[in-house]
């Protein structure tokens, strides 16, 4: 079982990480003459119970006075050191540049040790109502929070991939380093529900300051915050 070889050469980063993983699963099922479950072929790949999502939505609305007619934008500025990320000032520029057909509420999420940077970002948000939500109740509860988002914004980090598994609309920022590119760590949500930015070719591969934040705000606003959600 554990001595069947499938050569992948992941270091070339020719496709997303999840596709490499799918290749392993497909080969395993093929070797054992098991059909690939249809549910594995399209997102969402994580479907929380409706009652759990409704309860979490009500709790957030009560805790942060989020009005029913608003679009909730969740932004997770922390990265856990997993990859290069935008600065707090860039995230603030991005959020302040978002335009929507409804009022926006910006919920800044933070994990352990990230509350200081989240609070710093909160102080820079001028255009929209905002609050900080510190996640202390575990992964599943945090996923239920993320699932409330009309748009989820972050660098290449774990919460981004939770949002992708939930098929949330995502706006993500990556370095251009081959092992960390938008392609290699692409989220698993529908293509129409994701946007990704990285430093341009003329900039250094990890120069996150070279990303055009104004363009990102415009594209995210047009694709995700006006009209019906994609997908």
Predicted regions and their residues:
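Catalytic machinery of carbohydrate-active enzymes
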Residues: 1-231
